[in-house]
A protein has these predicted regions:
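Active-site Asp-x-Gly
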Residues: 1-11
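Glycine-enriched catalytic-core subsegment of oxygenase/oxidase enzymes
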Residues: 1-2, 15-19
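Short, glycine/acidic-rich hinge or "gate" loops at secondary-structure transitions
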Residues: 18-28
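Regulatory N- and C-terminal appendages and interdomain linkers associated
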Residues: 25, 31-124
């Protein structure tokens, strides 16, 4: 599921960052000792929060491109009934718009999947 993919990514990303703390953006010397470890956790949390927000916006753009662009989503194309396909595309575009314009509304990935379920239920 979407929630599992994000949770695994987040966990593994943090594991790798903690195991290999190298690079110019977050030099190890800045994060030594207990205060440094706390500061690093705070930096990691902030970085992942920004990455998550950006990922939501990117996902919204991809959803729009796959609905309106030339590279259509094959799952939508397989819906033979044009009215049903159009309804699915409208729901997809609605969620995509919200992901782009209101990413802060979705603090955790479960809120994204819950919103998708709400949009589907409202149009049923």
């Amino acid at each position: 599921t979407t929630e599992e993919v994000w949770s695994r990514f987040e966990r593994r990303f943090l594991e790798l960052w903690s195991a290999y703390p190298t690079g110019d953006a977050y030099p190890r010397a800045l994060f030594e000792g207990q205060p440094g470890r706390a500061a690093l956790r705070e930096a990691q949390t902030g970085y992942l929060r920004a990455l998550y927000r950006d990922a939501l916006g990117y996902a919204g753009c991809a959803m729009i491109r796959r609905t309106l662009g030339l590279a259509h989503n094959i799952d939508m194309e397989w819906i033979e009934d044009p009215d049903c396909r159009a309804a699915c595309e409208r729901r997809n575009l609605r969620l995509a718009r919200e992901l782009i314009l209101e990413p802060g509304r979705f603090g955790v990935i479960a809120q994204v999947t819950a919103r998708a379920t709400e949009i589907e239920a409202a149009s049923a």
